[in-house]
Amino acid sequence: MDRGAVVGFLLGVCVVSCLAGTPKTSWRRVSVGEDVSLLPAPGPTGRGPTQKLLWAVEPLDGCGPLHPSWVSLMPPKQVPETVVDAACMRAPVPLAMAYAPPAPSATGGLRTDFVWQERAAVVNRSLVIHGVRETDSGLYTLSVGDIKDPARQVASVVLVVQPAPVPTPPPTPADYDEDDNDEGEDESLAGTPASGTPRLPPPPAPPRSWPSAPEVSHVRGVTVRMETPEAILFSPGETFSTNVSIHAIAHDDQTYSMDVVWLRFDVPTSCAEMRIYESCLYHPQLPECLSPADAPCAASTWTSRLAVRSYAGCSRTNPPPRCSAEAHMEPVPGLAWQAASVNLEFRDASPQHSGLYLCVVYVNDHIHAWGHITISTAAQYRNAVVEQPLPQRGADLAEPTHPHVGAPPHAPPTHGALRLGAVMGAALLLSALGLSVWACMTCWRRRAWRAVKSRASGKGPTYIRVADSELYADWSSDSEGERDQVPWLAPPERPDSPSTNGSGFEILSPTAPSVYPRSDGHQSRRQLTTFGSGRPDRRYSQASDSSVFW
């Protein structure tokens, strides 16, 4: 029998038989040296045709320790299942064959026609193995069929043979402490071998009844309890949900936040089982977790989250889900939240939904509980094993395993992308508006500068400002005495020797009664005195137009 046939046979035993309503596969653990009775045959059929009963075994002693998992078949029904690598299995070996209804025999029960193992026998319609050994571990099956028809498997059991426990020797008199008082010494002397009476161990003291006292709890923080099915098998097109139960118990009055995070890992068909390294859940950045040796079949670290439901402001009096909640989920076709709970709902499930799902509970950003569920079809099912130690580091740096999120080809934009687009658009609009205002101000200032420069060119009289009254009306008086009487009306004194280090600017001081043109149409020429960059021993006088620059 090739390996494919062996795997198909196992799946038929573990899955198809359960779906067809036949007895489920059971697990049994025994110790070396015991006599084991397995797989009782169906009772006598009376007038029915004679049936052939066949017991066989598929050895699993080369597959290492087996880890059964509880698989949900049409919840809440659960059965223990596992997937065994075909490379470690051997061909099925027949053990015994009998016929029913039984023919009378000297020992009673079924008359066994063939027995292929010296330690096997059929007693009271059951297969009995005398003095089991570790090599007897395997998958035992019972098949029933007519004489002319092929046999049909009706029951199976996985037998795991463990080493026998080491017997502890009975206590000796030396194991008991002797009293230090004189009476104890007399008793020990009286019980010496010389006296001929061996010393007997003291009788056990009767249990003392302590008065009941109220329990005092010193626990602080939050305790989280989680219950998850280890596996869920579905058929394409079904609608089902994860049956996860989470209970958070607060031991003090402090507020806390809780996040329920769902992760998904692909399960390659080349893997006989998936390994979940618990240490990597708490320390995902370790080198062993980033590049495990069995990377395709290991759930060690991740880069994204499938779904998150966050609770904030929770306390002892306001536990989840009563505290404020916020949910986020990647857009995956056929996947949604089950109402307002922490469970996932699969609608019209397809084989693409198969995988290893992890549910991790964070309290104040620290892991408090986690569980795993293998969700797949019967053909894609692989067992998941939790490993406590760190994985072995791979020789080459492999890409870390991470949850796979299958987004649709044209996924709608999320709210975060919409908000980012709105902010970017507003920023661009404000930038364009600011540039427009800056350009207008620059153009206006340039035009104003040209106008002022043209007025100062000296081509003709230019009046920057026309006042409605004479600016120097008080200075236009011919009476020098009047100016002397009012000190603050006196014109500024002219220095006789201006500084030779002047800035080059001309300070114009009026000396005429008025600086405005006369009404008869001609311009008045008034004497103006200029101070500036001339030599200190010389005073310059020049005539200027009747215009003043402010």
Swiss-Prot record:
Query: What interactions and quaternary structure are annotated?
Result: Interacts with gI; this interaction enhances the Fc receptor function of gE. The heterodimer gE/gI interacts with the Fc part of host IgG. Interacts (via C-terminus) with VP22 tegument protein; this interaction is necessary for the recruitment of VP22 to the Golgi and its packaging into virions. Interacts (via C-terminus) with UL11 tegument protein.
Question: Which cellular component terms (GO) are annotated to the entry?
Answer: host cell endosome membrane; host cell Golgi membrane; host cell junction; membrane; viral envelope; virion membrane
From which source organism is this entry?
Answer: Human herpesvirus 1 (strain 17) (HHV-1)
Per the record, what ranges lie on the membrane's Virion surface side?
21-419
Spell out the protein name for this chain: Envelope glycoprotein E
> PTM Sulfotyrosine: at which residues?
176
Bias (Pro residues) occurs at 164-173, 199-209
Q: Where is this motif: Internalization motif?
A: 463-466, 472-475
Region annotation (Acidic) ranges: 476-484
> Where is the segment annotated Fc-binding?
235-380
Protein location: Virion membrane; Host cell membrane; Host cell junction; Host Golgi apparatus membrane
